Amino acid sequence: DKIIKKIELDKSLYENLVYYAASLIDTMELMAQPLYEIYRKLQEYYKAAVTLLLSSKAQENVQDKTVEAMLSYVILKGCRMKALQTEKYESVAVDLLEKVFHSINTQNQTFDAKYVAAAAFGYSEWIRNREYQDYGINKGGVLWS
């Protein structure tokens, strides 16, 4: 609760935590299997960060669409890599991504490169999640065979 209150007071902490979670999940993707203990520790940190990011009080106050787009990427990538339960987290990430694309479609303005890149990251993970799930359906539910 103390961390959530700090995040509520300082919005840059929320953004930093999103990028921290992104660095964790990106690192986990590139790690070799023999580093299992380190991987599990990174996964613990990642899950703790995502839990903090999705706490209702912390998330309600975020106005930065770039951070929302990056958070959708972080969650969707975690679902694809099985670091998070897809059934529990994917819908949250897809809702965030839909908000991002709704703002792109309805607001007649120019968006900065950081925002567009974060939205593209989120969208690419959404596509990859669909491909993995479709592949699993065709293989009797086995995703990694």
Descriptions of predicted regions:
Residues 1, 8, 55-59, 105:
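Acidic/polar residues at beta-strand termini and the immediately following turn/coil
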Residues 1-25:
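Loop-centered beta-sheet repeat module
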Residues 3, 27, 46, 53-56, ...:
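Alpha-helical solenoid scaffolds that mediate protein-protein interactions
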Residues 8, 32-36, 58, 83-84, ...:
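Short, flexible helix-adjacent loops and helix caps
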Residues 11-15, 36-40, 62, 111:
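Short, solvent-exposed segments of well-ordered alpha helices
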Residues 19-60:
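Oxyanion-binding "anion nests"
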Residues 60-145:
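CBM-like carbohydrate-recognition segments
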